[in-house]
From Swiss-Prot:
This is Cadherin-related family member 5. Residues 545-648 are annotated as: 4 X 31 AA approximate tandem repeats. The lineage of its organism: Eukaryota, Metazoa, Chordata, Craniata, Vertebrata. InterPro entries: Cadherin, Cadherin-like_dom, Cadherin-like_sf, Cadherin_CS. GO terms for cellular component: apical plasma membrane; brush border; brush border membrane; clathrin-coated pit; membrane; microvillus; microvillus membrane; plasma membrane. It is a single-pass type I membrane protein. Residues 693-862 are annotated as: Mediates interaction with USH1C and MYO7B and is required for proper localization to microvilli tips and function in microvilli organization. The modification Phosphothreonine is found at T758, T825.
Length: 862
């Protein structure tokens, strides 16, 4: 019993534990409701498809969902609890289900089940705007916050998200002007000075991201557009135009200049260069009105400036030449800014500067059928209106006071410098009118001539006419000789006309004038009109027919059956002068044409051919007999001067300027071609000179230079006989002995550059090898003309030893001059051995002795 009694305490403790620990619970479980789990945790946006929890309900009880539960979040089906919504942290971070167990209507047990919702990044940031515009002044200082953070900040519903901002430019180069203060602070600041005229507005795209890195998942971004409008500020002073811009804020102001006449008060505003006084507000967007004034330089208040438009006018005349330097001020109307510049006005004497037209002869055209009021077109450029202007050279202000009128025709009227028709143009014709220019200030008058062609269509432009000397005088003009064409044949007779002023010639009725490329004037200022006729016509009376002057272009197009001649031959024996260099006479032969460039002259006279550079191709048509020099019964024919282009049209004249397209070359084209050819010719000449100098230099050196003097064998007195100079002296008293007088060939070639020729008979013999100091005499067998030597006793000055040797030729008279030449002394022994017959009894022993002394002697040949 003792042993069993000892076993009870250990067994009693587990028994009590079971009885007191489990039995109450088991009894309670059998009496109240319960759930297997009452607290749940899940991420938002998680969907639970099965039951959330299992509920234990006693047999005599039932469970319901209490009213304090989260609405529409749970439901109870049987003994199971379901979550019927997708949890959202931003809407409800904690869901609660209140479960009630009842027995009948009596509440027995109540307990709660909680669902904790965890936040995740499931929401994108949001800006309070989509597009927003802001105005920024142009003069805003750098580093200024132009848009605060509160106006650009985005929001994110996620609790722990930190937004990152990025500014992207939409307008190119806009990012260099603005930037964000920081990646987490969207405040916008100015980084560079604004320029309204370069960037009047800029657009940016603002991004907000809820993750620091872009590639993180999940990541959300919001976008908004920011537009910045730059408002102009008053930063620039007024600018005088035209001005050279250095940047967008400053410019080099224009300075004005003009010339006015003395003694006259000009009624209209002065014409200045480079333009009128005009200033604008440098801030064009603000564009404040400008007020003008003269600050200084207006001596005696001579000038007045309009404060609104800047026009400068004269208040009084200026008696004598002087210069005004006006300082002109341009100020904004709000008086905020101003600028100054100079206007230099020179007063000069107008004497010596007459009113004159730019051309003494104008060519115009009007389409047939034109109504009244039609402007006359320029014949050279039919698409442009013909403008007739007279002016004073160097006085632009006087030109504004010039009025124009037509003096000899009621069919045209001047509208300023434009010529208008007053009646319809119904017939084809050529009309010549006189236009008069009158200066209302100086009362000067100038006239010019306008030749107007009325045709069915505007004639094609051939070559631009070269304007003649600016003409137009007020005095009466002299008679003008005009070469008019004849419709039958090629003879050309002069027609003499006259008109008042320098009006120029008027052609007879029915004459068709060619559209010449130039209208040269004859001496005196009257223009000579070029007419499409033959330039060289036959003159049976023997008179010379003068052809057009240089620069006249006369196309030469023979028609069928016509005989065209550009250079008539003279059967009476006179020579025909052909064109000079530079004359162009193009004539292209066609089938059936008989062309002769140089026909024979019946009387046997020589016909001068064209000089170098003359081009004389001929253009006859089928059946035409063409010769460049046809026969002329008598007299001489003067041909064109250099530079004259004379293709000629013969036969019936049906139109004007009927040249082929290939002949439409302007004066500028010819000048360019001439310049190129001249440059090529110059290069060819330079190359030729270099070649000649390289290959023939030694010949020019030996032929053009003086003969080299042989070195003397002894002492030479340079006082008596200077080098390189010929000394002339009379012959000695002794006459040469008679003898044969054949021509003595020169023993040595004379220098071609020698200024003093030596007689052939007195040429010295070639020097022989030196033996002694005696000169060599000419042998009798060597030359038919005997030459002998006489040694004179005449001594040289002290200190200069030696004698003078005089050589006499027998064929030289006493009246001949003596040429003194420096020659080296010949060998004495050779001279004595030669037995020259030039020596005679006058040679005394002293002279022979002096020869043997080896002294240097002067050889004088007579």
């Amino acid at each position: 019993m003792g042993a069993p009694a000892l076993l009870w305490p250990p067994l009693l403790l587990p028994l009590l534990t079971v009885l007191f620990g489990h039995l109450p619970g088991t009894l309670a479980q059998a009496q109240v409701c319960s759930a297997n789990q009452t607290v749940f945790t899940m991420n938002e946006n998680t969907t639970v498809s099965g039951p959330l929890a299992d509920i234990f309900v006693p047999e005599d009880q039932y469970v319901t969902l209490g009213q304090l539960s989260t609405p529409n979040a749970f439901k109870v089906e049987g003994n199971k609890l379901f979550l019927i919504v997708t949890p959202d942290y931003e809407e409800n971070s904690l869901l609660e289900a209140v479960l009630e167990c009842k027995r009948g209507d009596t509440l027995v047990t109540q307990f709660r089940v909680f669902v904790a919702v965890l936040d995740i990044n499931d929401n994108a940031p949001e800006f309070p705007f989509t597009i927003k515009e802001y105005n920024v002044s142009e003069d805003t200082r750098v580093n200024t916050i132009v848009i605060p953070e509160t106006e650009l900040k985005a929001t994110d519903a996620d609790k722990d998200d930190i937004l990152v901002y990025t500014l992207q430019e939409v307008t190119p180069n806009a990012s260099k002007f603005f930037s964000l203060v920081g990646i987490n602070s969207p405040a916008l600041k100015l980084d560079q000075t604004l320029d309204y005229y370069k960037s009047p507005n800029m657009t940016f795209r603002l991004l907000a991201r809820d993750t620091r890195e872009e590639n993180v998942i999940p990541s959300h971004t919001a976008t908004a557009t920011v537009v910045l409008n730059v408002l102009p500020a008053d930063l620039r002073t007024p600018w005088f135009l035209p001005c050279s811009f250095t940047d967008d804020y400053f410019c080099i102001q224009a300075q004005y200049h003009t010339v006015i006449p003395t003694g006259h008060k000009l009624p209209s505003p002065l014409i200045l260069s480079p333009g009128p006084i005009y200033a604008v507000d440098g801030d064009q967007a603000i564009n404040q009105p400008i007020v003008y004034s003269i600050m200084m330089g207006n001596t005696d208040d001579t000038f007045i400036i309009n404060k609104d438009d800047g026009n400068l006018t004269m208040a009084k005349s200026i008696p004598s030449p002087m210069t005004f330097t006006l300082v002109v001020r341009a100020e904004q109307a709000d008086m905020a800014r101003y600028s100054v510049t100079q206007a230099v006005v020179e007063a000069r004497d107008v004497t010596g500067n007459p009113l004159q037209f730019s051309q003494s002869l104008y060519f115009g055209t009007v389409v047939l059928g034109s109504e009244a009021g039609t402007a006359v077109k320029d014949k050279t450029f039919p698409s442009e209106i013909l403008r007739i202007q007279a002016q004073y050279l160097g006085f632009p202000d006087l030109n504004s006071a010039v009025t124009y009128q037509v003096t000899n025709s009621s069919e045209f009227i001047m509208n300023k410098d434009i010529l208008l028709t007053t009646v319809p143009m119904e017939t084809e014709r050529t009309i010549r009118i006189e236009v008069e220019a009158n200066n209302t200030v100086t009362k000067d008058i100038a006239t010019t001539i306008v030749e107007i062609q009325v045709s069915e269509r505007e004639p094609p432009s051939t070559e631009s006419p070269t304007p003649p000397e600016a003409g137009g005088t007020t005095g009466p003009s002299s008679n003008t000789t005009l070469e008019t064409p004849s419709t039958s044949g090629t003879s050309q007779g002069p027609a003499t006309t006259s008109s008042g002023g320098s009006a120029g010639p008027f052609p007879p009725a029915g004459t068709t004038l060619s559209p010449l490329t130039s209208a040269p004037t004859v001496p005196g200022g009257s223009p000579t009109l070029g007419i499409s006729t033959s330039p060289q016509t036959a003159t049976p009376g023997g008179d010379a027919t003068q052809t057009p002057k240089p620069g006249t272009s006369q196309p030469m197009v023979p028609t069928p059956g016509a005989s065209t001649s550009s250079q008539p031959a003279t059967p009476s024996g006179s020579s025909t002068q052909t064109p000079k260099p530079g004359t162009s006479q193009p004539m292209v032969p066609t089938p059936g044409a008989s062309t002769s460039s140089q026909p024979a002259t019946p009387s046997g006279s020589s016909t001068q051919t064209p000089r170098p550079g003359t081009s004389q191709p001929m253009v006859p048509t089928p059946g035409a007999s063409t010769s460049s020099q046809p026969a002329t019964p008598s007299g001489s024919t003067q041909t064109p001067k250099p530079g004259t282009s004379q293709p000629t049209t013969t036969g019936p004249i049906s139109g004007v300027g009927e040249l082929g397209d290939g002949q439409r070359f302007s004066t500028v084209d010819m000048a360019v071609l001439g310049g190129v050819l001249g440059a090529l010719l110059l290069l060819a000449l330079i190359f030729l000179i270099i070649l000649i100098h390289k290959h023939y230099r030694h010949r020019f050196t030996c032929c053009s230079g003086k003969a080299k003097e042989p070195q003397p064998s002894g002492y030479d007195n340079l006082t008596f006989l200077p080098d390189n100079k010929a000394k002339w002296s009379p012959t000695s008293n002794r006459k040469p002995e008679p003898g044969p007088e054949p021509v003595q060939p020169p023993l040595r070639p004379p220098s071609p550059m020698s200024s003093s020729p030596t007689p052939p008979s007195s040429m010295p013999p070639s020097p022989q090898p030196k033996a002694s100091g005696s000169p060599k005499t000419v042998q009798a067998g060597d030359s038919p003309s005997a030459v002998r030597s006489i040694l004179t006793k005449e001594r040289r000055p002290e200190g200069e030893g030696g004698y003078k040797a005089v050589w006499f030729g027998k064929d030289i008279g006493a009246e001949a001059d003596v040429v003194v030449l420096n020659e080296p002394t010949a060998d004495v022994d050779s001279a004595s051995a030669s037995g020259s017959e030039g020596s005679d009894d006058d040679d005394d022993p002293d002279q022979k002795k002096s020869l043997r002394l080896g002294a240097v002697a002067d050889n004088t040949y007579v």
